[in-house]
Amino acid sequence: MIPAERQKLLLNLINQKDVVSITQLAESLNVSHMTIRRDIQKLEEMGKVVSISGGVKMQEHLSFEPTYQDKSLLFHTQKEQIGKFAAQQIPTNTTIYLDAGTTTLEIAYRLIERDDLLVVTNDFSIAHFLMTNGQCELIHIGGTVNKLNHSSVGELAGQFLRQLSIDIAFVSTSSWTLKGLTTPDENKLPVKKALLDAANQRILVSDSSKYGKVATFHICPLTRFDRIICDKNLVEPVQHAIKELTVELITV
């Protein structure tokens, strides 16, 4: 059986269940585990499936952005670990961008003693926290208010960002795969694209639960990032594939 035919059968098998193990797939098609893993890697690169611990599942479509409140309740320990590590990597006398999100808020929590930083953000919760507790200089970029996500979005926000030169951008997302970042909210595109252009170094900060989800609007390929900081639950095949893209991956 040629690979294309086998991969089509794999998709049919995976589509019938929520999660299928490598062993189940190998037995169903009477091929080796190694053959199945190669096929899965190919299907994942095509954006069809997602590797998870112990198996594989169909890629999940994200149709709407979770609210800020909902995000704050999910995977808190992983976000804390990512935020702590990311904050420790920030050099002195740096201009950084903290993208809107609960993971980047964890970075902000660890910057209250830093009086050598200029922090730029589109997140109202981050701005309020640093304005109240921090010693850094602070810029909120303004723009159209997204109340559910406590952030500013749209072309006005993007225009402001295009006037800046940022040393390090810490970028958040609700959906990413090996093909890159996506969003269900078209209004986020101007901000995301402008901050990626404005930054000298781009770091994606995301817990592993966001991996494998895809939304309607494409933001950028994964190769736009210099580094990805994620938790250790990101499965090994995905970690290996990211490193093959020559993007530095750090799991904490």
Regions found by a protein language model. Name each.
Residues 104:
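Conserved SAM/SAH-binding loop
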Residues 2-5, 9-11, 15-23, 27-29, ...:
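HTH-adjacent hinge/linker in prokaryotic transcriptional regulators
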Residues 2-5, 9-14, 18-24, 30-32, ...:
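Conserved phosphate- and dinucleotide-binding cores of soluble alpha/beta proteins
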